[in-house]
Amino acid sequence: MSILIRPYVRSRDDTLWIDIQNRALNEYPEYTPETLRDFELHKQGPWFDPTGMTVAELDGSPAGCADAWIDRNADEEHGYLEGPWVLPQLRRRGVGTALAQAALTNLRTRGKARVQLWHRDNPVNVAFAESLGFRCVRIFHSMNHDLKSVPRSVGECRDAAIVELPADDATVELECRLWNESFREHFNYRPMTVAETGYMYRTARERNVWLFTLVAQLERQPVGFLVGGSDPAEVARRGHNIGGLYMLGVLEPFRNRGIAKALLISGLARLKEKGMTEAELGVDTGNITGALHLYERLGFKTTRRRLTQTRDLT
């Protein structure tokens, strides 16, 4: 049995990369398969960097892939291991370990002192990460809310005006500023650029994803924001009308005043108006604002967990 780890070749390996990733992740019902068009949009984006992308071949046939990714816009001591993704029928033959070890070497060679890995919380994934020397540092919850009813009178700020903004350049710039001001104390924060924020809106349009942006205003000044929406590909995959609340932030001086509750209630109502029957959001258990408990009080329930693991490369 021979395992070869080779570099990803741009364009030539695109279809192969998508096929491996889609087949490897198909066991997760929340995963929406990627198309070649999706991958092309990803390649045009500000985060794409093929430097650390590798493909594994087992006895001459494609078996898996992984990405030793570095955020070029961040001044970080760590890089990221994305994957490894291995075809289901070829697992437990050393392919995933070979891909991971190659990624760790790649990041070390490129000057990184640590590496982060994130994965679905299940025994197989946890054991694999532990075998590579990783330790868990954060737990990320995916939480869902049935939209048969939207909570009201739960302490939301009555003085805040919740305004829906158009997806134009002014909104992109405002959202970018609010995101940076709201999340600067959070885990793995680094400043978001206007170009990155604009890219998210552009790709949503091109993929026919519905997005909406709500801003909370006090005395006409923006103090918080929420971005939500729905992806028709995800709806088709999961078999029901599910929408997401993708980002929620409140400026630090205005926290604990019910503004996040007001934004959440308006976001849930907006999803329901659009015909969604379920809402989903994500939260880090270590979130300094205590957001997990806020979501629980509003009726969100945890449906799955993702772990962030780390290890030194020195």
Where are these regions (language model features)?
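Short amphipathic alpha-helix that is part of the acyltransferase structural core
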Residues: 1-41, 55, 62, 155-192
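Acyl-donor-binding surface of acyltransferase catalytic domains
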Residues: 1, 61, 72, 88-160, ...
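Conserved acetyl-CoA binding element of GNAT-fold acetyltransferases
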Residues: 76-88, 238-252
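Active-site rim helix/loop that mediates acceptor-substrate recognition in acyltransferases
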Residues: 21-22, 28-58, 62-70, 190-218, ...
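Active-site/acyl-donor-binding loops of N-acyltransferases
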Residues: 132-152, 265-269, 273-314
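Glycine-rich phosphate/pyrophosphate-binding loop shared by adenosine-nucleotide-utilizing enzymes
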Residues: 61-65, 79, 220-225, 243
